């Protein structure tokens, strides 16, 4: 159980494990009709690898299966968010050849609600990442990458999704070790010291 506050009133979030993750918001002893479900679908570390693999005569992974699942849940449930926690790039021959552009085009079809920058998003360089962000039809966020000469943020630091009267805040942060990997980009830094 996680505890959040909304207008100074405690709100408990219960995450139920299973094929889907449901978050139920409880305030005191309210009746079931006042409880809202929020389904959060999450993926990360796709690394530009979009093909399913045959494991024990079953297809595992792949964007077509992921897309089918995300679309199925979006049709069956109310209040569904799909989020990607980075590392969309670098790992497949196709992604490397097209430097992430092919990946972004496929991600656009998945229509995530929000994406954070992961450690491999910087592999093609910060300037290319900013170009790729312009190709995305979804928000890409990061709160701590900035230009060292003027402290200008490279990305929007957060994204708020409003759904069924709920406001869900997403914040994207890279660790210092990831930022250190971009050391050849001397003008890029972090607000974290």
Predicted features along the sequence, with ranges:
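Short, low-complexity intrinsically disordered segments enriched in A/P/G/S/L with frequent Arg
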Residues: 12-14, 18
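Short, Lys/Arg-enriched N-terminal segments with co-localized hydrophobic residues
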Residues: 19-31
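Cationic, low-complexity basic patches in intrinsically disordered or flexible, solvent-exposed regions
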Residues: 7-10, 22
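Acidic, metal/ion-coordinating pockets
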Residues: 28-193
């Amino acid at each position: 159980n996680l505890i959040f506050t909304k207008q100074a009133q405690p709100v408990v979030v219960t995450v139920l494990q299973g094929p889907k993750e449901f978050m139920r918001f409880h305030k005191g002893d309210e009746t079931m009709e006042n409880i809202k479900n929020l389904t959060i679908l999450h993926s990360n570390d796709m690394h530009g690898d979009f093909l399913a693999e045959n494991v024990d005569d079953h297809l595992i992974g792949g964007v077509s299966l992921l897309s089918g699942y995300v679309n199925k849940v979006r049709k069956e449930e109310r209040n569904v968010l799909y989020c990607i926690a980075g590392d969309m790039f670098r790992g497949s021959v196709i992604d490397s050849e097209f430097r992430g552009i092919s990946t972004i085009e496929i991600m656009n079809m998945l229509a995530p609600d929000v994406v954070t920058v992961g450690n491999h998003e910087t592999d093609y360089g910060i300037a290319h990442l900013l170009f790729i962000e312009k190709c995305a039809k979804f928000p890409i966020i990061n709160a701590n990458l900035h230009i060292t000469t003027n402290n200008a943020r490279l990305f929007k630091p957060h994204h708020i999704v409003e759904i069924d009267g709920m406001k869900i805040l997403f914040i994207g942060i890279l660790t210092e070790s990831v930022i250190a990997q971009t050391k050849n980009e001397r003008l890029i830094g972090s607000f974290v010291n």
